[in-house]
């Protein structure tokens, strides 16, 4: 049975609360998922019930257009997350799940994790991970990340179509930097705390994203559209997509930044049951 926002929202709220905080002790088996994003690297741990119990997040420019351009930086962050989690739980993770943008080489993410000392227990593309987490049927998933937007169509629990477009939060930052006449780094920081203020300037970028999504889902006969990714947290996004797709039920849970990391960690729990930190 498909999960809904009432099922998902408390898990995302828990993840947001735990982010870079010291978690409570637990005796549960633990599964790790690592999300290598364009703007951030997130390592999330879930327990036997699929509940988030720890989240490490670093804002980092290590991935661009689905390619790890700063390999050493990415490996260093993942190792630091592993050290932090070992200190917190008293156990070292040896396996982790990860993901990749549709249409790119999964070895890119796998190589980072292996170089950090991990064995990859499961790997899948980002929108498929979200679709699996939510157990969707007859729905579309749009994962707007930092550098790319992943799109997947799910029918009867199976992904029947997926694509990746080179547009995302990085392009929003570029637009904002030009509008404000500030550096790209300043724009990245500014947009996180001034969402409503910057909406008029960045709205055209999201309109373009919605047009791209419309092209990919045309004729697919879906009834629901789920939005994921940190770039969806911009105020105004949900309303824009609902106006663009009035015939669809558009879902945008709070704290969508953590949807893909939760989906990745959960996929490891489901697909690699025996591979966990004990």
From Swiss-Prot:
Residue stretches in coiled coil: none
Chloroplast among keywords: no
Pathway(s): Amine and polyamine degradation; ethanolamine degradation
A Pfam short name: FtsA
Keyword set, alphabetical order: Chaperone
Similarity comment: Belongs to the EutJ family.
Function according to Swiss-Prot or TrEMBL: May protect ethanolamine ammonia-lyase (EAL, eutB-eutC) from inhibition, may function in assembling the bacterial microcompartment and/or in refolding EAL, suggesting it may have chaperone activity.
Name of the molecule in the record: Ethanolamine utilization protein EutJ
Organism: Escherichia coli (strain K12)
């Amino acid at each position: 049975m498909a999960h809904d926002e009432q099922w998902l929202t408390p898990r995302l709220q828990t993840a947001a609360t735990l982010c870079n905080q010291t978690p409570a002790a637990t005796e549960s088996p633990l599964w790790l998922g690592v999300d290598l994003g364009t703007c951030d690297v997130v390592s999330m741990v879930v327990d036997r019930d699929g509940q988030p119990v720890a989240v490490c997040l670093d804002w980092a420019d290590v991935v661009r257009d689905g390619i790890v351009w700063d390999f050493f930086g990415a490996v260093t962050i993942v190792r630091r997350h592993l050290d932090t989690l070992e200190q917190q739980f008293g156990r070292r993770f040896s396996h982790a799940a990860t993901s990749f943008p549709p249409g790119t080489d999964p070895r890119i993410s796998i190589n980072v994790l292996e170089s950090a000392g991990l064995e990859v227990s499961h790997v899948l593309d980002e929108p498929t991970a979200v679709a699996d987490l939510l157990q969707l049927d007859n729905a579309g998933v749009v994962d707007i990340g930092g550098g790319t937007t992943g799109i997947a169509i799910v029918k009867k629990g199976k992904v029947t179509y997926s694509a990746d477009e080179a547009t995302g939060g990085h392009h929003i930052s570029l637009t904002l930097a030009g509008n404000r006449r500030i550096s790209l780094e300043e724009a990245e920081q500014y947009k996180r705390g001034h969402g409503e203020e910057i909406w008029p300037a960045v709205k055209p970028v999201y309109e373009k994203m919605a047009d791209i999504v419309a092209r990919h889902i045309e004729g697919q006969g879906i009834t629901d559209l789920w939005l994921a990714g940190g770039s969806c947290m911009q105020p105004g996004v949900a309303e824009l997509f609902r106006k663009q797709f009035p015939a669809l039920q558009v879902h945008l849970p709070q704290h969508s930044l953590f949807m893909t990391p939760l989906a990745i960690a959960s996929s490891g729990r489901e697909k690699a049951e025996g591979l966990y930190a004990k």
